[in-house]
Each structure stands twice: as C-alpha cells, then as structure tokens.
C-alpha cells in the first residue's frame, strides 16, 4: 500500500478499522486484534499505521551471539523495508523482568522509521521518548535489567494476535489489529 494511503488510515480509530475488516471477512470478529489489557503512553496522538518489524526478547535467557552483534543486525533489519514501521516485540516471559524499551531504543527506532512499539513486555523513560512515538505495552518497569534480543523477523504471538514481519498494523489507545 502506498505511503499516502496508509497515512489516510490514521483518520480512523482502530475500532472503526476492525468494523471494516469484519465486513470484508467475518473471521476478523474473532482474530487479528489485541484481546488483552495494555498501557498506552500517548492516547491523544494519531493512530499508528505501519508495517510490522518483529522480534523476540528475553531477560532471563541470553543469546549466544554477542549482544552488540545481534543488536546491529536487528537495527539493520528494522531499517529495511517500507515506511512507516511499527516495532512488534514479544517478551518471552509472562512477567517481564526488564525493559528493552526506553529513551535509547525509542529514539533509535524513531530514527529508523518506527512510529512506536507494541509489546507484551515493559517500557520505561516515559518522559524522554520522542514526542509522537507510541508505546503500547503490557506494563511499566524502572529497570532495563539484562534484556537480550533472541531473534527477529519471525512470527510473534501475544495479546491475542499473531503478527508476521511486514504485516500491516493499525493501532491506537483501543488496541491493535493486523
């Protein structure tokens, strides 16, 4: 879909997009949208509409690849592809111990073309993220702990959704649909 057409979808909230999808395909009444409670940092900004850049993280397991090596590969992956983008990060732990998302990663992802993040993990540094960058997360955490990227560009499942790399997503204060 062309960039300007994507921007036009920001005029609609996510429930309206869900209604339209349900008219086109009744299976969207039970799939494709978030079904769990989450925290929305900026409820008043326009909805995010963009292409998914997926990853899995862990704060209890660590990747065999060096931390800096996999992060650089991941940032190159996020930089590739069509704009705009939405980072979709699956935390492999039911109760996240640390936050991948804060001032540093929000600014890096913003510069790489991401409008925000959808994660079942935690976020922090709320007062210093870029102005129109959105956090839709399961929880807040004061610590980044020792979070490792485990893999990226793969399918992730959380909050009742299944999202693949490059899926088109619409998300706002109400939730997300892909």
Where would I find each of the regions flagged by the language model?
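General beta-strand structural signal in soluble alpha/beta enzymes
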Residues: 30-33, 88-90, 117-121, 135-137, ...
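Buried hydrophobic positions in well-ordered alpha/beta secondary-structure cores of metabolic enzymes
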Residues: 21, 109, 167-169
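Short coil/turn connectors at secondary-structure junctions
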Residues: 49-50, 82-85, 112-115, 130-133, ...
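Protein maturation boundaries and topogenic segments
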Residues: 23-32, 105, 112, 121
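Acidic, glycine-rich flexible loop/linker segments
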Residues: 140-178
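Ligand/cofactor pocket segment of small-molecule handling proteins
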Residues: 106-141
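Intrinsically disordered, low-complexity regions enriched in acidic/Ser/Thr/Pro/Gln residues
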Residues: 1-81
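Extracellular/luminal Protease-associated
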Residues: 77-119
């Amino acid at each position: 879909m062309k960039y300007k057409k994507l921007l036009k979808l920001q005029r609609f909230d996510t429930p309206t997009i869900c209604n339209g999808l349900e008219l086109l395909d009744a299976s969207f009444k039970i799939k494709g949208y978030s079904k769990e409670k989450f925290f929305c940092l900026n409820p008043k900004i326009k909805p995010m509409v963009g292409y998914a850049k997926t990853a899995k993280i862990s704060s209890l397991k660590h990747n065999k690849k060096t931390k800096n090596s996999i992060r650089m590969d991941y940032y190159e992956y996020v930089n590739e592809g069509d704009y705009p983008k939405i980072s979709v990060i699956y935390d492999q732990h039911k109760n996240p111990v640390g936050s991948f998302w804060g001032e540093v990663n929000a600014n890096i992802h913003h510069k790489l073309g991401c409008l925000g993040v959808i994660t079942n993990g935690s976020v922090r540094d709320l007062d210093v993220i870029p102005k129109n960058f959105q956090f839709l997360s399961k929880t807040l955490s004061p610590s980044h702990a020792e979070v490792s990227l485990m893999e990226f560009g793969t399918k992730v499942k959380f909050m009742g959704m299944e999202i693949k790399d490059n899926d088109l997503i619409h998300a706002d204060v109400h939730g997300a649909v892909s």
